[in-house]
């Protein structure tokens, strides 16, 4: 409780908006003394009453007017029910809704602001609040309370009873409470943001009520989830224009599938922390941009390393802006028969307030503790989709896949997932790779990792430098993943922005692909050997040759896919899996980044060697090929490759 006393402060002129006859009267502040405890928040029923405790016998008089003013400037007069030297009771108007209100007391033409209060307005609960409870409430739909909804403050986890009521013994560390949206229900939206959480209003030791109202929906067993990889919006390199191409593609895809339920999950790095301050483009600007361009789609969000405030000096403060604007950094929800978990796997406790941004890829012990409690309510037969920003594993030329997280932390995380069928979805790399349960790195667990390509591809650089080419460091086109869910069955597909779902691979006639130092005439002749050698890796990979080899980039490849290549005579050519640099990305980005007279160090965002490539050798330079790729779900894509096949950036622009 906070004590408020009325004494002379200032002269206030205020037009009172009210349903009463006092509306429109100008009131002048003057000194009159009333003392009572004004709580931070109160729980009231609609049209109900509340008792305020008076101090030192200084209570209001019967002719005083008690006023609540909403954030929209609407004032409500609360009639006195009774007044004594110990307390007074007011009736809260039925029109008042949950929210913050300024509290005024008016005596004759004198009016004084007392302070601010938060009203939690709801139905009366059949509940005795436990002694240690600090957060409680009801989860309900139009049909009444919903039993079995999991509720958490990020530390403690509880479940609603048969009336939809929950209680939490919360220290209120995170300042919010959230529900794990139950199957068959949806929450309301604020733009693209699903409102599955409530921000806490009172101090840690003060009990407060937070209710959740859900909408019952049907047909949730069959739906799509759009996995949206790194966006990196910063209002530079024409990113906002390119982003509108993505949202147009997204909206066109949704329009082409009318009547199908769709949700989306952003995989992190919606923003670019380096430009929050220098370019005045941060989380609010991201939300403003996407809310203008995408309507009627709930996007659950994941925090990425570029969504933290680099000016902070610890993890808690670094993620506070994200929490304030978007959502909790870890939570869970259910859609149909699938349980989704969103994890924060970026640890910023080593931040020093500078752009050094020293972070670690790890899941905090607090999250692991919460996850164990969350999964205690999830049957082992329920498939899990776990979403986090940074990759858990990473391909290695020598070792297949390796753990790319804190090793001890990862072991603890995987141990919690034992017995479940788990699909982990990540971003961060801006490239595409897939880990399947057959990989030794999963240690025999039924775990998949889908590292999903970026919406921004090469941080928006490829289309900026070479208009019409929007690809990432491994040659994956900028785009997003489409997951089809039917009951407990999941299917996935990667879709490139600006083209159909049938664009799943790219072929190169290596007789036509070659790079040399003549491609970078502006690169300084005295550039360091380190920088020059970085460029020479592309020259050495693709010298001028006539070996009649064809390179095929299948960016969403996994071991369950098949590749078949036949020549025009019907001969089967045996593909060889290779690590390679994508030639189109070399030409569209790397060559142009190295071809600079001001070059002094190795440029960022250049082509990386990656494993989802295959080579075949044709009989001669003119032999045409039929290339057929098939995924594990039976989707088949074919190219009739006419050779020689031209290699220029213009030839590879999407038509």
Language-model segments: residues:
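Ser/Thr/Pro-rich low-complexity tracts
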Residues: 22-125
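Short, ordered, surface-exposed loop/turn motifs in non-cytosolic proteins
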Residues: 61-64, 133-136, 141-155
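N-terminal active-site segment of His-dependent metallophosphoesterases
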Residues: 127-134, 141-142, 184-278, 655
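Conserved catalytic scaffold of divalent metal-dependent phosphoesterases
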Residues: 141, 210-218, 231-234, 322-401, ...
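Extended active-site neighborhood of metal-dependent phosphoesterases/phosphodiesterases
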Residues: 184-201, 275-378, 404, 408-423, ...
